Amino acid sequence: MDYGLWNKLFSADLLTEEMLDNGLAYNEDLLANWRAFLVAPGCAFCDFAGYHYRQHAASASHRALPPQSIDDQRRAAAEIRATAPAEMQQSVNAFYYEKLVYLASMILRRANATDYRVQLNELKIGIAAGADDPQLGRNPLLPRSIRFSAWLTLHMPRLWQWACRNFLKDRQ
């Protein structure tokens, strides 16, 4: 029998309690899917031009998230990075650095960004530490827009905060 997990279909034998109860309140689905993916003997991709969470009005992706959400998302990304097989490391490192930059932009777009100053400072430390690293900020798989956003986060934070607040309207 097959079971669905956040719009993915898995064999029931594949899923474990630990995968599903991973201690996260946010990005728990991402981490559960990653853990299942790592132990799956194979997978099939069905192209669907949509994203169910964004299409659902009650989705958390439409609400401002509490500081814990930032911590949970960083924890999920760090575990994914730490557990990636060698052949996926370059891709996962790009994902990890992009997640740091995205989370910083998520904070900067908020009117109450000062409530997240601890998280933002931690993210900036991670972004700065990886800026010249060929596996992170200089990773060839990292989109230029993310490299530019990282640079703005570090070197022009006020301008970048203004841009985030005026042009990145979700999750304010």
Which stretches of residues belong to each language-model region?
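Conserved nucleotide-sugar donor-binding catalytic segment
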Residues: 1-65
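Residue-level signal for well-ordered alpha-helical scaffold segments within enzymatic catalytic domains
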Residues: 13, 17, 35, 75, ...
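Short charge-dense sequence patches
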Residues: 20-33, 70-73, 161-168
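Catalytic-loop motifs flanking and including active-site residues across diverse enzymes
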Residues: 32, 76, 96
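Catalytic core of nucleotide-sugar-dependent glycosyltransferases
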Residues: 49-56, 63-88, 100-103, 110-131
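All-alpha amphipathic helical-bundle segments outside canonical DNA-binding/catalytic cores
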Residues: 88-95
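Membrane-interface aromatic/basic loop that binds lipid-linked glycans or pyrophosphate carriers
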Residues: 109-172
